[in-house]
Amino acid sequence: MTDAKMKKKRTTPFLYLASIVFLPWWISLFFKKSLESWVTNWLNISQSEPFLNDIQEKSLIEKFIELEELLLLDEMIKECPKLDLQKFRIGIHKETIQLMNMYNDDRIHTILHFSTNIISFVILSVCSILGNEELVILNSWIKEFLYNLSDTLKAFCLLALTDFLFGFHTISAWELLIGSVVHNDQMRSLLVCLFPSVLHTIYYFWTFNYLNCVSPSLVVLYDSLVDVD
């Protein structure tokens, strides 16, 4: 009975870790599929006119003007003796509907992403509150693992993590990650420039604070590895 309890005590933190990693993703994916049809119907029924912010409205007007010019140019290239205004208006109307549908789909995806992010945050918060004992066990295991590493290996792991998160080759990964949450081009470009830099500064501050607490010699070793890199 004692062995069974000890085995259960060892496996419970791993099950808890797997649940906080995969459970929010599974549930948010389920809610996203369930909410998609409801959000689409709500937007189509409750909103008689599309709601656009200033940036979206400006972008839509620019695309509409560009579309109008392209259709007019297409009619001129055909060398028609007389421009068919009725056909031209029909073409403009069809393309305008497509543009509005595109912006409507963008709004739907924005609402779904925001909703699923809130759901994931709530699930993680509940798991953190209910699994306080498992968190303590995991924290003790991580501290013991880090304590048993040599100073050189600790510095190497920190340097590898720094390069993995903030290296010059990670720009595309940050663009993909931020683009999956933020769909506005201007906001995405701003966050791609600012977010990694701010996170990098916080990470460096935490790293040197941690190294000073663990072993001051690690700071010198880490600095030397950074200079070599």
From Swiss-Prot:
GO cellular component: chloroplast inner membrane
Reaction(s) the record says it catalyses: K(+)(in) + H(+)(out) = K(+)(out) + H(+)(in)
Keywords: Antiport, Chloroplast, Hydrogen ion transport, Ion transport, Membrane, Plastid, Plastid inner membrane, Potassium, Potassium transport, Transmembrane, Transmembrane helix, Transport
Compartment annotation: Plastid, Chloroplast inner membrane
Superkingdom, natural source: Eukaryota
Any one GO BP annotation for this protein: potassium ion transport
Family label: Belongs to the CemA family.
Function, in words: Contributes to K(+)/H(+) antiport activity by supporting proton efflux to control proton extrusion and homeostasis in chloroplasts in a light-dependent manner to modulate photosynthesis. Prevents excessive induction of non-photochemical quenching (NPQ) under continuous-light conditions. Indirectly promotes efficient inorganic carbon uptake into chloroplasts.
Protein name: Potassium/proton antiporter CemA
